[in-house]
Swiss-Prot record:
It is an enzyme of class 1 (oxidoreductase). Keywords: Dioxygenase, NAD, Oxidoreductase, Plasmid. Induction: Part of the abs operon that is induced during growth with 2-aminobenzenesulfonate (ABS) as carbon source. It catalyses: 2-aminobenzenesulfonate + NADH + O2 + 2 H(+) = 2,3-dihydroxybenzenesulfonate + NH4(+) + NAD(+). Inhibited by o-phenanthroline. Heterotetramer with a alpha2beta2 structure. Gene3D superfamilies: 3.10.450.50. Optimum pH is 7.5. This is 2-aminobenzenesulfonate 2,3-dioxygenase subunit beta.
């Protein structure tokens, strides 16, 4: 598997999130997929986990997202510099820089957060699958909590 194919997979994955096509996004994830959002608190001197879900928990979370009060804008994820940092057989660890913007309904755009994705990607006969994603945010003060995967 070449790095260009892995990068294209991750770009498509981000585009599905940008379009809020969550069912299609989840289809790209393995059955044992795990998702975590974390950051380091300078004040506490330790990491903080803001979200930690498996695939079924995330699916339930997304099914109910519109039943709760949500921000009115949409998030747009911009990925940069995906690098394969580890490889074992058909499994790849990929670190990617990410900038997340929020586009309000009136057209205003603001930076939501920056950080990195550490993805584990598995090559299967049916194609690539995301087996885990850890979002490590450098930004620690968000305008609003993440109602959808960032």
């Amino acid at each position: 598997m070449d790095t260009v194919s892995i990068a294209e997979f991750l770009y498509t994955n981000a585009d599905l999130l940008n379009q809020e096509q969550f069912d299609s996004w989840l289809e790209q994830c393995s059955n044992d997929f795990s998702y975590r959002i974390t950051t380091f608190s300078e004040e506490l001197g330790r990491p903080m986990d803001w979200m930690d879900k498996d695939k079924s928990g995330l699916a339930h979370y997304l099914q109910n997202a519109n039943n709760h009060e949500r921000y009115t804008g949409r998030l747009r994820r911009h990925l940069a510099m995906p690098r394969v940092t580890k490889q074992a057989d058909s499994s790849f660890e990929v670190r990617t820089a990410v900038a997340i913007y929020v586009i309000e309904m009136n057209g205003e755009t603001a930076l939501y957060g920056i950080g990195s994705y550490v993805d584990n990607v598995m090559s299967e006969s049916s194609g690539l699958r995301l087996t885990s994603r850890v979002v490590t945010l450098d930004t620690r003060r968000l305008q609003f909590g993440p109602h959808v995967p960032i």
